[in-house]
Structures are given as structure tokens and as C-alpha cells.
Amino acid sequence: MIFSLLVHSPPSSQASFSAYQFADALLAQNHSLYRVFFYHDGAYHGSDIQCVGQDEFDLSKAWGVLQREHNFDLVICIAAGLKRGIIDSKEAGRYAKSQHNLSNTMELSGLGQLADATVNSERLISFGGRGE
């Protein structure tokens, strides 16, 4: 079965960790993961400058490792990312910013990628959002 995930929550939330565990489990069961779309506060997953304590699980890094092992898309909503200071080199140039901080395992893109994930997946599972 082909899945896509929609993550609304920041890396520090239980909902985000549950999304990662779900992705890891479905891949272990030989299902396919088409795309993980990070929306609203989920955009914070894209920050490459986030520092996690030595005794904490680095969820953003873990997504990158899982993505490299299983070759699926990790997409940060561009509007949510820009609003939260997550920016790639292209957008840094566009907005005259001297730096960028998007993780190299992720991409910034619009809601069309979420619509595409809905069309190309058999299931879209959402994690986080209101009332986490």
C-alpha cells in the first residue's frame, strides 16, 4: 500500500514522533511511503540549524536518515516554512537574505505537493494539528 503523511506539529511534539514511528513501521512492513508533507508548525522539521540535546532524539535528522534509506519525498510547505524562518538558497536570494537553513534532505514546495500526494497515495494520514 502507498502512504503519504501530513505532519502539522513541531519536532518536539508527540504527534511528530508518532508520525516518524508510523513511517518506520509501515516501511518495515514493505509498504511504500510516497511523501511526508510538513505543514504549519511541522515546518520546523526543515531547520538544519536546530540543535537537539545529546540525551534527546533528533527527529529531523532521523527523518533524513529514513528518507535516504527508502527514497521518499520530505516536503516543507513553503508558506509555513517562510513564515517560521525556514528558507532554502533560492528563496534566500529572492528575499535578499544572506543565509539559508533548509535541511538538504528536504525541499520547500507549495500545497500542490500535498494535492499530488493525495492523488498518488492510497492513504493520507495526518498527525498533529488542533488539540494535539
Region annotations inferred by a language model:
Residues 78-132:
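N-terminal glycine-rich phosphate/adenylate-binding segment common to multiple enzyme folds
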